[in-house]
Amino acid sequence: MKTGFNRRSFLRNAGVGSSVLALGPLAASLATSTAASAAGAADFDTIANRVGHDSVKWDGALRNEHIDHVVAGMGIADMDYKAAPAITAALRKAVQYDNWGYIDMGQPGRKAWLKSIVDWNHKRYGITAMNEGNMAITTGVHAGILATMAAYSPPGSKVLLATPIYNGFYGDIRATRTVANESLMKFNNGRWEIDWADFEAKASMPDTKISILCNPQNPVGRAWTKEELTRYGEICLKHNVLVLADEIHCDFISKGSKYVPFASLDNEAVVKNSITYKSVSKSFSLAGMKCAWFFTTNPEVYKATVFHNHADLNTLGMYAAEAAYAGGEGWLNDCVAYISDNHDFANDYIKKNIPMIKVGQKPEGTYLQWIDVTAIADKIGAKKMADDANQQAKDAASKMGTDYSGRAGMAEMRVQTPEDMVQHWMAKNAFVQLNAGTSYGLGGANHMRMNIATSRKTLKAALDSMAAATKKISA
């Protein structure tokens, strides 16, 4: 990882060559600002005011739930904290330049930029299988996954998933006209575990071509062990199923748990039968910057994925990512520790104060809680509410001469689930927005996903509001 700042290297890494010498003030001051910001203590008790800034998490909650205020947006997976100071400083300097045309990623700076990513992964995660020759840049993990799917999972083939799992994968599956091959995990002693017999049975189906692994697992919070990943990989290798490892949440590991990169496994054949996707977007809350990458030790998989990877790089995203690596590691370490404590706080609070919500063991990874809302759904009659909403939509569609479809793409015509009703109820009664569990596949029924990457004060306010709302219906 780079520890200092080199003006020429910075310009090269931006891919704009000597024509950007007007960025001299940026280059001259970035090292100082990065070092200064890295030295200061991070403040996660003070969050950005995201309302009024078109935030999906906050403004989206107001718009979608038709409420006039929100105590906490706890849905989509981004963080409420102010960005690492090193990132903000770099971007402020970068926008002093007055032209945002195409950049030439064929310049020598591209190698320096890739090296900074490789160095970070070597140092922080011990991923020695990664190098500048077997990785490539893309705009996001989804874009990378779609590129691999285009090469290895033809329309109609099956995609193996251990569920509940990140709902975005289902969008990728629909986009590629493939089919989800779901293996429901077991919930044992408050912990989700793969049902290995079922997983292998699904992997052995002849039309199962790929398996998307989420490591750590969103939304259930498992940080997979070396033994679990090895078994996962060996089953997939045995049945000629390519592993697509989404490790975007890898930095958010709770105290006492460990992130094991799939590419670090001892079995070289298992590793070669995989491709890994990573990004700065979760670690440093840079989802809007569109900067990610993938790597694999398999030359064939690399070439095929690169061939289908039609994603360009966001210039500011590159500046932000480089600044994060140069001066953001301390901030990130503090952030991870703060979120681990948030998990403890949330688990303890819910167990003591919200008996209508059940939680399992503390999540080992991610900044997401997977909560059981069965009691709430039963109490508010969520199933009947969903049935009524679906019938009303069907009747309205019939009057318009339109076929009713749960996949119509129109909010008023989408099939509603009991979990959707709990989501709406929570928004209107506690003014807290959560994600409905059914969108995460098999095992999502009676569950909600809750994002705790916010200040302790906001987290407590949200839980207080949820406790008060559920208390009113608990009698």
Where do the PLM segments sit?
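N-terminal secretory signal peptides and thylakoid transit peptides that target proteins
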Residues: 1-21
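N-terminal small-domain helix-loop-helix segment of the aminotransferase-like
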Residues: 39-140, 326, 473
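Conserved PLP-anchoring active-site segment centered on the Schiff-base-forming lysine
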Residues: 149-173
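Helix C-cap/helix->beta junction micro-motif
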Residues: 176, 238-239, 430
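Active-site phosphate-binding strand-loop segment of PLP-dependent enzymes
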Residues: 187-257
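PLP-dependent aminotransferase class I/II
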Residues: 273-352, 356-364
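Conserved glycine-rich beta-strand-loop-beta hairpin in the small C-terminal domain of fold type I
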Residues: 339-347, 359-376, 386, 393, ...
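PLP-dependent enzyme catalytic core of the Aspartate aminotransferase-like
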Residues: 385-475
